[in-house]
Amino acid sequence: MMDDTFNKWNKWIDVILAEITKLSIDRHIFWEVQDIINNNPKIQKPSSFYDFLRNVYGASAVMGVRKQVKIDKDSISLAKLLQEICDNPKILSRTRYFAHYKGSTVKKIAKLMGSTVEKYRSKEFDQFAGKIGDHVNPELIKLDLEELKSKAKMCEKYADRRIAHFDERAIS
């Protein structure tokens, strides 16, 4: 059961990474175009294309963030992954984490840090385990989940009140 859940989470991470990477690339492209416009006085004039670009990028970014905070039954999102980790913290054990430390790159990093692989990986895992020690601390994950939801709240309001439909209520 634990391996099935772990494998499911790994598949989710691939989906989440692809979605977040897309958001990051879209953001980069949008701001590169803004730099082109800002650095070229000849094209700095009102334009329906610029309005379109802002609207499409804004809607896409807001919906992309919104996707990552949904915890519906069939959703794959960062929030749902964090919630499942909170509910099943023993799946992310120190032993499982250490099993992924292989290869010369880790040895080089540990050596650069003036450490051994064992000490380096233990110190790194301790950030996630806290006082619990043998698996991730669900309270730390819960804090991350709460921060994600808090920061995404304005995007959700905007999406609900301006993108999905136009609401009479202000976004505030």
PLM region spans:
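Amphipathic alpha-helical interface segments
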Residues: 1-149
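General N-terminal targeting signals
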Residues: 40, 171-172
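Histidine-centered, metal-coordinating catalytic motifs and their short helical/loop contexts
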Residues: 145-171
